[in-house]
Structure formats: structure tokens, C-alpha cells
From Swiss-Prot:
The chain crosses the membrane at residues 36-63, 74-93, 108-129, 147-171, 203-222, 239-263, 281-304. Its main location: membrane. The gene is CCR8. Signal peptide: none annotated. It is a multi-pass membrane protein. Disulfide bonds join C106-C183. Pfam families: 7tm_1. May regulate monocyte chemotaxis and thymic cell line apoptosis. Alternative coreceptor with CD4 for HIV-1 infection. It is found in: Cell membrane. This is C-C chemokine receptor type 8. Residues 1-35, 94-107, 172-202, 264-280 are extracellular. The keyword Zinc-finger does not apply.
Length: 355
């Protein structure tokens, strides 16, 4: 599997092929102990992401009941992270053994990765544009920032992410290399240019276009806030801005390495040492990018005031139900605290626009 050249969902590969006509350049980087540690890391990411994003969905659906367009975007962003992380169990098994799930699942699991990648960046872009409209064009935003509009845009994002992913999956297959079944994307002499195009497409759709929109939106927002000095609007964009910055920090390094890999495929960068360095850089930056799927819930917990209150409310209700099931009465102090949290949350709803 040509892992460095192809953004695959798997990391078991031991060799990097700088050219389809040359012999492989030995770039074995992950030894047995390293694979075990990496597998444990993926398992931890899976657990924390599954738990964190499930709590986000629970808060948005049960507590906030999707009352705003931003709630819709945050819900879909959490679903995108969950879709991304669903590839981890397959990836972990593949890392430790071989691909035993067949060609169809090879394409499906790889699709989870790509769709999760594209949709995550697209939803963050939508949230940035939404903040821009809410702050800079507040009157116009009242007309267009509706639940129906948000749902329609989210459906468009999912469709775009799927359409961007489907051409990539055509080349994925399962083949045996040295007696080990591997899931990888195969490119021959005729399709090698398509592979390079795919890498550049990911750079453009996954980083360049979103980053350009981010810069435009937040420059305009900061200019507007500087003029108006509106504290409520400043609070309203803080969470989204932190999510955007975090996503860029996790994904920019990988996109840079992907771009350099494309240059290597075109022989602009050449040499065995370059290929080994790119292989190593891909592994490292991919691990960094994978971590993004469990970061957003942590940001909400530390930055989102209402998110913490809603979690406290859910915890109190759950404890109350457990006490009732056991035939006991919940301590009065906890009930009063839960009631106080609910009242305070309702009073602050007019101030905080998002989690």
C-alpha cells in the first residue's frame, strides 16, 4: 500500500514507492512495539471521541432541542467526527494484523475517513460564514439564519463530501503483499496523474478554500466588533473561532506534507531520503490530524458556558432517575442545585448564542 502518496485510512504499510517503475525505498518506521502503542492510541481516541461527541449530540438534541442554526451546524459537526472515528476499530485491527474485512469494507471504511475529513472542514466553514452574517449583516441574517436553511446547507455539505469522496474509492482494493492482505489505493501508469490530482484536490477543498473563507470572515468580524464594541457578539463568536483555529492546527501540517508528497510524485522533490522523510512526516502529521475528532467536545466543555450547565442538568436528572429506580429520594441539595442550573441556563439563553 502506497500510504504516503495516498491518504489511506490505514497505517500498516512498511514501504513507500516513489515511482511505479522503481524498486521500493525501504522506509519501515513502525516496529511491533510502535504499532502496539499506536493501536492503544487509536483505541483511546475512539473511546474519547465516541463519548465526547455523543454527549454533544445529547446536549444539542435533548437540552437545546436544536433551536438555532448554529445548533444544527454543531450537531452535524459532531456527526462528522463520529463518522471519521468509526474507521478506527478497523484501522486498529489492520495495524496489528492484516485487512480481513474484504474489498467492500475497504472502500466503505476509507470512505468514512474521506467523508469525515471533507464534511468536518465544510461544516466549520459554514459556521464561520454563519458568524460573519450574524455579526456583520445582522438584519439580513434574521431572514436567512433559519433552521430550514441550516438543514438544507448541511444536506448540501454531506452531498458534496460524498461526491468528492466517491472518485477516490474507485481505486481502493484488497491485495496480498508478501502474504499479508492490505487495503490500499492502486494507481498504474495511466492513473498516476489522477492520484496527484486527488492530493491537490484535498489541499484545495480541505484547506485552501476553507482557510481563505476563514480569513475573510474573521477579518470582517473583528473589524465590526472593533467598531461596535459589542460584548455579547464577542462571546458569540469566541467558541466558533477557537474550533476553527484548533481544526487548522490539526490539519495544516498534514496538508503541507500531502502537498510535498505530490511534488515528490512529480519528481520535483526526489530521492530515497526524501521519500523516507515524507513517510515519517505523514505518519506523524496523520496522528496529529486524527486527534481532532475528540478535541471539539473538550473545547465546548472548557469554553462553552451553557454546555457545562446542560451537562450538569443531564447528570442531575440521571442521578434522580437512578435514585427513583432504587426507591430512594434524591438529596434535596442536589435537586435545588439542578433547579438553579435550569433557571440560570434559561436566563442566560438570551446572552449566549451557542454552546
Amino acid at each position: 500500500m502506497d500510504y504516503t502518496l495516498d491518504l489511506s485510512v490505514t497505517t500498516v504499510t512498511d514501504y513507500y514507492y516513489p515511482d511505479i517503475f522503481s524498486s521500493p525505498c525501504d522506509a519501515e518506521l513502525i516496529q511491533t512495539n510502535g504499532k502496539l502503542l499506536l493501536a492503544v492510541f487509536y483505541c483511546l481516541l475512539f473511546v474519547f471521541s465516541l463519548l465526547g461527541n455523543s454527549l454533544v449530540i445529547l446536549v444539542l438534541v435533548v437540552c437545546k432541542k436544536l433551536r438555532s442554526i448554529t445548533d444544527v451546524y454543531l450537531l452535524n459537526l459532531a456527526l462528522s467526527d463520529l463518522l471519521f472515528v468509526f474507521s478506527f476499530p478497523f484501522q486498529t485491527y489492520y495495524l496489528l494484523d492484516q485487512w480481513v474485512f474484504g474489498t467492500v469494507m475497504c472502500k466503505v471504511v476509507s470512505g468514512f475517513y474521506y467523508i469525515g475529513f471533507y464534511s468536518s472542514m465544510f461544516f466549520i466553514t459554514l459556521m464561520s460564514v454563519d458568524r460573519y452574517l450574524a455579526v456583520v449583516h445582522a438584519v439580513y441574517a434574521l431572514k436567512v439564519r433559519t433552521i430550514r436553511m441550516g438543514t438544507t446547507l448541511c444536506l448540501a455539505v454531506w452531498l458534496t463530501a460524498i461526491m468528492a469522496t466517491i472518485p477516490l474509492l474507485v481505486f481502493y482494493q484488497v491485495a496480498s503483499e508478501d502474504g499479508v492482505l492490505q487495503c490500499y489505493s492502486f494507481y498504474n501508469q495511466q492513473t498516476l496523474k489522477w492520484k496527484i490530482f486527488t492530493n491537490f484536490k484535498m489541499n484545495i477543498l480541505g484547506l485552501l478554500i476553507p482557510f481563505t473563507i476563514f480569513m475573510f470572515c474573521y477579518i470582517k468580524i473583528l473589524h465590526q466588533l472593533k467598531r461596535c464594541q459589542n460584548h455579547n457578539k464577542t462571546k458569540a463568536i469566541r467558541l466558533v473561532l477557537i474550533v476553527v483555529i484548533a481544526s487548522l492546527l490539526f490539519w495544516v501540517p498534514f496538508n503541507v506534507v500531502l502537498f510535498l508528497t505530490s511534488l515528490h510524485s512529480m519528481h520535483i522533490l526526489d530521492g530515497c531520503s526524501i521519500s523516507q522523510q515524507l513517510t515519517y512526516a505523514t505518519h506523524v502529521t496523520e496522528i496529529i490530524s486524527f486527534t481532532h475528532c475528540c478535541v471539539n467536545p473538550v473545547i465546548y466543555a472548557f469554553v462553552g458556558e451553557k454546555f457545562k450547565k446542560h451537562l450538569s442538568e443531564i447528570f442531575q436528572k440521571s442521578c434522580s432517575q437512578i435514585f427513583n429506580y432504587l426507591g430512594r429520594q434524591m438529596p434535596r441539595e442536589s435537586c435545588e442545585k439542578s433547579s438553579s442550573c435550569q433557571q440560570h441556563s434559561s436566563r442566560s439563553s438570551s446572552v449566549d448564542y451557542i454552546l
